[in-house]
Amino acid sequence: MDVNPTLLFLKVPAQNAISTTFPYTGDPPYSHGTGTGYTMDTVNRTHQYSEKGKWTTNTETGAPQLNPIDGPLPEDNEPSGYAQTDCVLEAMAFLEESHPGIFENSCLETMEVIQQTRVDKLTQGRQTYDWTLNRNQPAATALANTIEVFRSNGMTANESGRLIDFLKDVIESMDKEEMEITTHFQRKRRVRDNMTKKMVTQRTIGKKKQRLNKRSYLIRALTLNTMTKDAERGKLKRRAIATPGMQIRGFVYFVETLARSICEKLEQSGLPVGGNEKKAKLANVVRKMMTNSQDTELSFTITGDNTKWNENQNPRMFLAMITYITRNQPEWFRNVLSIAPIMFSNKMARLGKGYMFESKSMKLRTQIPAEMLASIDLKYFNESTRKKIEKIRPLLIDGTVSLSPGMMMGMFNMLSTVLGVSILNLGQKKYTKTTYWWDGLQSSDDFALIVNAPNHEGIQAGVDRFYRTCKLVGINMSKKKSYINRTGTFEFTSFFYRYGFVANFSMELPSFGVSGINESADMSIGVTVIKNNMINNDLGPATAQMALQLFIKDYRYTYRCHRGDTQIQTRRSFELKKLWEQTRSKAGLLVSDGGPNLYNIRNLHIPEVCLKWELMDEDYQGRLCNPLNPFVSHKEIESVNNAVVMPAHGPAKSMEYDAVATTHSWIPKRNRSILNTSQRGILEDEQMYQKCCNLFEKFFPSSSYRRPVGISSMVEAMVSRARIDARIDFESGRIKKEEFAEIMKICSTIEELRRQK
């Protein structure tokens, strides 16, 4: 029979139909090749927005720099970065007037954080520009390399010290006349293979010492490496994002700590909270505006969009904000916080890998590295690239570009939110001194503006005033992309509001399904996603039950673990059938071992092993939870793991799921091909680092881990801990006298070896 599709919506309120408009099936686009072109675009655009500023030259690096601050007031609607210092300071003063003590309290909180933060905070985070090797590395490795270089150059760096002490070293390093670093390089030799008697290329990794003079070191310390942002939907062109080096990261972290603390106290800020908490916060602002718009008043909301938020922001403006916010604070604190914006005012952008050329006729490919762009003949490039390179040439130094204005993506999200909120704050009647007034929401570059006024002219005047006020601090509301509606319907950070926030369940669709980590984690993540969507996204019981059945089906097809009594033939079915037949209690078999599914929407919170434990045969229990099983190298798992789930929009989210370690929690082995590349030395360093950390965690279980252990080294801390634990175990009779003596002997030997070293 034919179903009329409109019948589906008869009983559904219009706002719930949003989940049917989901456009993002299929994979998002990824970038290939180099990001050099995108980075040049960013640099050229940023300079264009600030072109009427003043040019100066950095005395240390010789880099030309453009300063648009206090530049000409705008005469048209073109985006521009000419923020006026006095306007920004005044906005800050009014923000403080509306929230007495907010800056003072946030400064106190931040000082406390600065005193307590350990340098290992910087190991969090993904790719980081490693200035010693001049390319990207995992954060932990980049930090270890930096500390190693600092130490060999006579600084006091310490892996377990405070972050503030590491930052003192960074400052000191900038005053040094030269820095000695160790770089990796590759040697290739042609040798004859004994077995096959063929000639093969053998690669060896060499480490060599290199001296950087002050200028070269400063350029590297101020460099942000660039890459292309991947998986961005709904865009025709890719764009560049920045990864800063270790010198900048620590300073940025403290500035963002201060700004986060301020944002937490501002009701208009969409950061740093998320999820339901964010929705509640935002709903409050809307409610306030709607209740206050008496029957005589009109209320309109703009779903706002800003033009090139980052490229029109300016680090010098952030410096002014910080100077004001910390004005009554101790000198050291003000200095620490002002370094990040100063470094950003002098930043250099690395152009990435450069361009790839290929000649179709001669079947040749060659890479033109970014360093060569300053001197290469431009006749080889097409029209648009030629224009880009010409524009950028005056700014080039050693393959990096001087980029003083602009902020690069994702660097000061919290602080720029504070700036945005300070303009929303000026919408109160006591500041507008007229019949219209405004309020709104701000989250990084995204905003929603609610304007109330007695008539349409008032609304228009309010919007105009907001627009112009923003211009004065370098915020450019896009008139083309912003949309105005009667209050009650708008969008903010992909939340859709219609008389309350609408659960847009379809946004979570990409995270349903089998993650592909391993059988154990995938089962756990799959049911947790369904559980979370029932809690947060209006996923109803019937739909959830269906989602669960689809997930189990998907899971069985992925791991070829159909029920033991099924007719489906796969590579595993022979083994699974055998297991099924010799198992007394078939309900106890995990789904991944061909067992039945016992999940329903009431027990999604229980890990499968726990759900079925009582139903399992004893020998099956023994095989399943056997840490000595030689066929499985599985990790030791804390009770909670983190999975990365991909919603359709916005960044990948981290989601906790329960992890029970079984022989199904295997880890796939690392691809061997890396061992023949220049990465090998780094891989060995990384494994060393990993081993040390794992060992340390064995001595200091998670409760005491990451607590300051004085300034003793990791080894000293572990030895003293081992002695204490051994004594306690010996006195309580858990270990014998011989064992106790042996432990003490090992400890002494370790100390002796350290002394000799």
Swiss-Prot record:
EC number: 2.7.7.48
Region (Promoter-binding site): 249-256
A Gene Ontology BP annotation from the UniProt entry: viral transcription
GO cellular component: host cell cytoplasm; host cell nucleus
Polar residues bias spans: 55-64
InterPro entries hit by this protein: RNA-dir_pol_NSvirus, RNA_pol_PB1_influenza
Subcellular locations according to the entry: Host nucleus; Host cytoplasm
One function term, GO molecular function aspect: nucleotide binding
PTM text: Phosphorylated by host PRKCA.
Keyword Nucleotide-binding applies: yes
Class of this enzyme: transferase
Residue stretches making up the RdRp catalytic domain: 286-483
HAMAP family for this protein: INFV_RDRP (MF_04065)
Protein name per Swiss-Prot or TrEMBL: RNA-directed RNA polymerase catalytic subunit
